[in-house]
């Protein structure tokens, strides 16, 4: 049961890392768009999702969202075996993406305006400017805070136990209920969390060294 919990935790972490980076990138670009409507939508997204606890969104997508759909669809979702995992991924994604967008937006604003002018002078379109010039620099400049954010996102996977997602914390609670050996189960789960977070931080630091980025900000990631 504990190993299964670790596997589900890793699935949640990997899925939400990818989806929140993608969604956060889109929101960040919207917030710095020259189109006012896009800026307003991006800003509203961040203000709404950043100021409401992540646990709320996990509960919302598990309990409320199926009720908002046509009855047949809602019924299928409620009886879908893996919906607790799916709802957890969606809830964590929309929450984490609001923070990721803020980080990436700061990275975009830190890029000298001449970089974009140079891209325009070479004939690159707006999409190509982002793909080939701006996005690589945005991610490189913001890797330390992004890494820290992803470690926090990993720890937030434990919130999914509230909707019976069989991740590590939920598995620990079940073991305690079945065996009454809560101390041992909790200690083992703690070691798993420390080990997994340590692997994440080490991988990020190695990537930063490869890219020659100052990684001092990651020293607080486990706090």
Task: List each model region and its residues.
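Transmembrane alpha-helices and adjacent helix-loop boundaries
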Residues: 1-223
